[in-house]
């Protein structure tokens, strides 16, 4: 799926495996602004996984999309807070609630 992020076309790839994307061995998703891709891991139930993986996958996707917005806005290269995972998590987690206000 392709999305427009501040005028840049990003490709979102879901259900990706560690075999195709080795970074998924460490992360459930990542954003690569050098090739405008957002990669989301294939979420599989296990004894250690969260119960609602659909909810979690959406949260991971929002997290990576926010990284892409910060990157495309230029803030990634000019500000430490734009790379701060806690800030990105905050917006990814709270965005659905914020959207209701707008």
For the regions a protein language model found, what residue spans apply to each?
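Active-site scaffold of zinc-dependent metalloenzymes
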Residues: 1-57, 71-72, 80-93
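Active-site recognition of the HExxH zinc-binding catalytic motif
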Residues: 59-71
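A glycine-rich, hydrophobic loop/mini-helix early in the fold
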Residues: 77
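Short, Lys/Arg-rich amphipathic alpha-helical interaction segments
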Residues: 97-102
């Amino acid at each position: 799926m392709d999305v427009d992020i501040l005028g840049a076309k990003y490709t979102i790839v879901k259900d990706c495996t560690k075999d195709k994307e080795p970074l998924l061995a460490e992360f459930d998703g990542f954003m690569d602004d050098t090739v405008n891709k957002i990669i989301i891991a294939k979420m599989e139930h296990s004894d250690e996984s969260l119960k609602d993986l659909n909810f979690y996958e959406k949260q991971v996707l929002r997290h990576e999309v926010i990284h892409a917005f910060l990157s495309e806005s230029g803030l990634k290269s000019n500000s430490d807070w734009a790379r701060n995972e806690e800030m990105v998590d905050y917006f990814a987690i709270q965005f659905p609630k914020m959207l209701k206000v707008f």
